Amino acid sequence: VAFGIDFGTSNSVVALADGDGPPRFASFELLGRSTASFRSLLFFDLDEQRPAEPVVFSAGPAGIEAYLDALGEGRLIQSFKTHLTTASLGRTALGPHALDLDELLALFLGRLREGASAALGAPIERAVLGRPVRFAGSRDDQACARAEARLRRAALAAGLGEVELELEPIAAAYHYEAGLERDELAMIADFGAGTTDFCVMRIGPTHRGRRERSDDVLVTGGVGVAGDNLDAALIEHVVAPALGKGSYYREFGKRLPIPPGYYYKLSRWHQLSFLRGSRTRHELERLAQHAESPAALEALMMIIEDNQGFHLHEAVEATKIALSREPRAAFDYVHEDFEVHAQVERADFEAWIADEVAEIAACLDQTLARAGLEPAAIDRVFMTGGTAFVPAVRREFEARFGSGKLSSGDELSSIAAGLAGRARSWDAAAG
């Protein structure tokens, strides 16, 4: 029984490859609907926590439902995969409990494992787990090694007795390869929420199914710029100004700008929970008393205190997706005490994300250069992940390879399917 686990920054997916057919995906219930996505988040109802008792929490779809039922009370933690490279993060206070990142990861992976085991009707005791080429926030190989070690520890603590790690773009290559009838030299581009990863690989019928594939991989590359960075641009330019960014307050006879740090954390999903604390609340209350636009600061406090990160994320994501289809899109965020509405032009959005797109394109060029290849040598470009559909990103690939060489895969399941297929190959070789 071969399992693949795609632990993503925003969403996680578990696949099972049993027999010779295509992988099956664990399915979960969310608000009465079936989904293969297990949202990468944890929710803690602080009223349910008791000293000397295990921490009470929900994860994935159940975490979303518990969060919605709690009407903003409690602690929502999302995008925690982005913290994997952090050397010292401290502990997260959860009522009488205080958990470090390793413990939070183990809670999430354990609940994912339990839910997927029940959904697939088979206990998950060993699996192939995906990892990016370069973890988000990694500045050197030491940071990447720290992140991988942390991921392995958490997987073992979550009940996975045996774990193999595979690079996510290589897993996407295995998924794409499963449908090929002839060999290709492929460029794989995996666009996640926290990282963008590439690999150049020989794939096809003569390569498929072998356990040892290292000779087929010409090069890998990655950069910690991806979907969350594009979300941050929308927060910075559309949402934050309505919440006081760029405005001023008066104190001690001086006119001073509202500190930008609050808005930076607001725009980074993995840092949003850090704003929920008495110190931040007192600082913002003081600023609001002296602000030229106090209502905007009060709205920012409501988003923080009412734990609105999930709802804000949904509104931003909807606008980003719409901008991939249309030249303009509406941004609509509704709180019970205030609303933020805006029309966003695709041209403006592309100007805001120009630096991020340039970083992705530079990593693509560096990956090709390290392989010693010109774009014309690539037979096919397989792109997976939501950012693959952002027109500004897609144009970079069209300019290098031509639109005829580009193909896209299922943004949700490609990685997990490839990981499960790889697990099946390893099991077959071991058997």
Residue ranges of model-derived segments:
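Conserved phosphate-binding catalytic cores of ATP/NTP-utilizing and phosphoryl-transfer enzymes
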Residues: 1, 160-189, 417-424, 428
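Gly/Thr-rich phosphate-binding beta-strand-loop-beta motif of the actin/hexokinase/Hsp70
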Residues: 1-23, 176-213
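Short beta-alpha connecting loops at secondary-structure transitions
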Residues: 25-27, 65, 214-224, 297-301, ...
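Active-site nucleophile and cofactor-binding loops and adjacent substrate-binding regions
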Residues: 28-33, 164-170, 224-225, 407-415
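Helical "lid/coupling" subdomains associated with nucleotide-phosphate turnover
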Residues: 208, 232-247, 267-431
